[in-house]
Amino acid sequence: MAVYTNPACRTNTSAFPGPYRPYSNPSRFSFNLDKFRPRTSAIKVPSICCTIAREMEKERSEREPDVLQRPDSFGRFGKFGGKYVPETLMYALTELESAFRSLSGDQVFQKELDGILKDYVGRESPLYFAERLTLHYKRPNGEGPEIYLKREDLNHTGAHKINNAVAQALLAKRLGKKRIIAETGAGQHGVATATVCARFGLQCVIYMGAQDMERQALNVFRMRLLGAEVRAVHSGTATLKDATSEAIRDWVTNVESTHYILGSVAGPHPYPMMVREFHAVIGKETRKQALEKWGGKPDVLVACVGGGSNAMGLFHEFVDDKDVRMIGVEAAGFGLDSGKHAATLTKGEVGVLHGAMSYLLQDDDGQIIEPHSISAGLDYPGVGPEHSFLKDIGRAEYYCCTDEEALEAFKRLSRLEGIIPALETSHALAFLEKLCPTLPNGTKVVLNCSGRGDKDVHTAIKHLQV
């Protein structure tokens, strides 16, 4: 079988079964990032489960677009993103995108969504001045940054994930889909999806790695209590990557009746764009609240990055504000040199996984390397394509913190502010130890507290002395 591949990327065998083609209908969208189009060449590849398809060529427009206008008409963020999926999913993705764009301008839909976010989810979430954490980072001369927490942990279900789950459930209802599937790592997206399915009377199936089910037993019980069927995934590493693969296989089989609520800004177009837009409320509220609290904008934004949805929800509003630093923090696990980490943007290379081109953790043959993080929500070998794009153009910075550093930050916030953060959030909090000594006095730092840590207490007990 002749297929087309991009020599800048590698293939891997863990993404999709079946034949593939790239998204190839450029006429329906107005965006274009042709400037970043990857070079292509045709080569023959023997029997593989996921091919890197040839990028569609198109004429350059006379006027170069803003490079930060994204995605383009192919669902690409520069060379990242796209739609590398089985033929059976093309119609569903096109239908989903059409519905999303239509409902974006539907005032009835938006009013219903806003009402649910306010009365059911509990938005807006507070922008909280962490006074004692701020004092902790004061230098001997009394100077230092001011730290604010965007309290997504106070949302219904305890994390930012509910923003996207509610919106996609409403979208699924408009599409006439009665069955919902989702993947989950830490369990927060699974709980959020099970919650909205209970709210709207939809059948719910959650795929979760067997290893993650063991370390997130509380969330497994919560999902089942809410009426969801939780299916354990034992293949591969039995973590988030494998749960995502199983969810996609289910979707391929049941695409007519089923909507897949993907939980991050990853996957094939339009998911990275759509999930970003549903989480953009985080950044929009932050801008408004910052103006109310100190009459300006944040100077620095900090968020943890696994797939990257909470970070993108915070960052998106400020991407065009060049004076606002955006910092994503990945999981360094046992350390970058150990090989046991999930620092995709720090150590990864470009490839295709789960329908999109992005940075991945992979070996010389393009096979996915098993990631590691004490945090189930960061334990993923890929990352959202827009994060890859922001990294490559230098708009966002990405660093990483180890399991040990995250655990110390978990304890630190608990004792200084009386807030028990999720282990995912704890990675972002841990980076403050390195960041704060470098910041000028009075710098306004907003850190996205993406989730609460109740779910992680069982894990923390094994590692922390309190």
From Swiss-Prot:
The keyword Heme is assigned to this record: no
Enzyme class: lyase
GO CC aspect terms: chloroplast stroma
InterPro entries, sorted: Trp_synth_b_CS, Trp_synth_beta, Trp_synth_beta/beta-like, TrpB-like_PALP, TrpB-like_PALP_sf
Chief location bin: plastid
Compartments in which it is found: Plastid, Chloroplast
Catalytic activity annotation: (1S,2R)-1-C-(indol-3-yl)glycerol 3-phosphate + L-serine = D-glyceraldehyde 3-phosphate + L-tryptophan + H2O
Sites bearing N6-(pyridoxal phosphate)lysine, chain numbering: K161
Cofactor(s) the record lists: pyridoxal 5'-phosphate
CDD domains: Trp-synth_B (cd06446)
Entry annotated with the keyword Plastid: yes
Pathway: Amino-acid biosynthesis; L-tryptophan biosynthesis; L-tryptophan from chorismate: step 5/5
EC number from the UniProt entry: 4.2.1.20
Protein keywords: Amino-acid biosynthesis, Aromatic amino acid biosynthesis, Chloroplast, Lyase, Plastid, Pyridoxal phosphate, Transit peptide, Tryptophan biosynthesis
GO MF term (any one): tryptophan synthase activity
Domain of life from the UniProt record: Eukaryota
PANTHER family: TRYPTOPHAN SYNTHASE, TRYPTOPHAN SYNTHASE-RELATED
Family the entry assigns: Belongs to the TrpB family.
Role, per record: The beta subunit is responsible for the synthesis of L-tryptophan from indole and L-serine.
Description of how the protein assembles with itself and partners: Tetramer of two alpha and two beta chains.
Protein name: Tryptophan synthase beta chain 2, chloroplastic
Organism: Camptotheca acuminata
